[in-house]
């Protein structure tokens, strides 16, 4: 009887050791987001929200390919789950002047997506998009214009107020969304 109990205890201990090793092995195999393609990185962040911080950290990497991958994943995340990036806006804003056009246009695109889907005012997002509208890159300006149009379609009053505030005329492509029309917004 004592031998059977001892053997049984050994078997339980062995099973626990195997489970512990398997768990440690699984933890060690976490693939960094920087090594993933955009769709996989987005799926990972959605299933493990605390990894968003890792994605945001990638924006500050010295390697352009890593920053680009992060920006593309954040733009895709903004399309499907914009609310998940609301708290990350200050971190995203830190990188709006990145050296890479690719990174900048993805971030501007993300600002437009997030701003168009929030229930509060879009004015804070407009200032970010406005930075893109004055960018040296034609592609960034084009993406910023589309993002601003998306915001204008959602909240035309915010657009009018923003351009009054910055004392600039409303661009014609945005004026068509405003209640008083292009002629009333020439400033």
Predicted segments — roles?
Residues 10-57:
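N-terminal "cap/leader" segments of large eukaryotic alpha-helical scaffolds
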Residues 14-18, 163-187:
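Eukaryotic acidic, Ser/Thr-rich intrinsically disordered low-complexity regions
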Residues 16, 46-58, 82-95, 119-132, ...:
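Amphipathic alpha-helical scaffolding segments comprising HEAT/armadillo-like alpha-solenoid repeats
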Residues 24, 35-39, 53, 68-71, ...:
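Alpha-solenoid HEAT/ARM repeat scaffold
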Residues 35, 64-65, 101-102, 136-139, ...:
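Alpha-helix N-cap/helix-start positions at coil->helix boundaries
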Residues 48-76:
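A positional/architectural concept
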Residues 75, 112, 149-150, 183:
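Structural signature of alpha-helical solenoid repeat scaffolds
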């Amino acid at each position: 009887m004592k031998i059977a109990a001892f053997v049984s205890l050994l078997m339980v201990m062995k099973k626990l050791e195997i489970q512990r090793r398997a768990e440690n092995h699984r933890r060690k195999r976490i693939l960094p987001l920087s090594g993933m393609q955009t769709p996989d990185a987005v799926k990972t962040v959605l299933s493990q929200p605390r990894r968003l911080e890792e994605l945001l950290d990638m924006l500050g990497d010295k390697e352009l390919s890593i920053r680009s991958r992060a920006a593309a994943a954040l733009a895709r995340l903004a399309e499907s789950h914009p609310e998940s990036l609301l708290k990350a806006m200050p971190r995203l804003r830190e990188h709006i002047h990145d050296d890479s056009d690719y990174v900048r246009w993805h971030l501007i695109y993300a600002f437009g997506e997030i701003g168009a889907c929030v229930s509060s005012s879009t004015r804070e997002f407009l200032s970010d998009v406005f930075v893109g509208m004055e960018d040296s890159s034609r592609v960034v300006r084009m993406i910023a214009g589309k993002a601003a149009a998306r915001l204008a379609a959602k909240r035309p009053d915010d657009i009018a107020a923003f351009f009054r505030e910055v004392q600039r005329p409303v661009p014609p492509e945005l004026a068509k969304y405003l209640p008083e029309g292009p002629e009333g917004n020439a400033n």
